[in-house]
Amino acid sequence: RPCVEQMYFYNDDDGRSSFINFINTFKNQAAWSIEDRKSFVRVYSNTGAHVEIFANKPETEQNGISSIEAYLNERKLSPSVIIHRGHSFHTESTLEKIPSSAKLIFVGSCGGFYKISMALENAPEAHIISTKQVGTKTINDAMLLALNENIRTGKDIVWNDFWDKMREKLRDNQYFND
C-alpha cells in the first residue's frame, strides 16, 4: 500500500504562492512525477517506496478537496499524512478533516502550534510537525521534500537526526527556529 498524503491549500495569496512553490519543489526531482487532475494534483514517486501526495489547487479549494476525497474513497485509500498549507485562519478547516488514519500531521501555518490539540482529537497517536510563530513555504517545502525522500527511500525517520539535518540545511533561514 502506498504512503498517501493529503495537502490542503486555500484560495488566497499565501495559498496560491505556497502551491506554486510546492509544485516547483517536486517538478525537477527525477524520482517524482506530477499528474494534473484538474481540481487537484497527484505527486507520486517513480522509484523506491510508493508515495502519493494529493494536493487541491487553491483556486478550486473545496471542489479540489472533495475530488481528492472521492478519488481516495474509490480506491479505498486513506491518508496517513495530513499537511496544512497557508494562512493560520484556515488551519481549523484542515484540522477538522483529519482522519483517524493520520500518522503524521504537518501544520505549516503561522502559529500552527496553538491548534495542535484539535489535530490530536481525531488522531491522538499522530506525530506532529508544527510552526510556533511564522510559517514559511521555503522551510515547509524543504522539510516536506526531505520527509518524503526518507519515506520514498525506505529510511526510518529518526527525529533527532532529521532535525539535525534540517538545522544544517536551513540554518541561514531566520524563521527555522520559529
How would you label these PLM feature ranges?
Residues 159-178:
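Caspase-like cysteine protease fold
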Residues 77-154:
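Catalytic cores of nucleophile-dependent amide-cleaving enzymes
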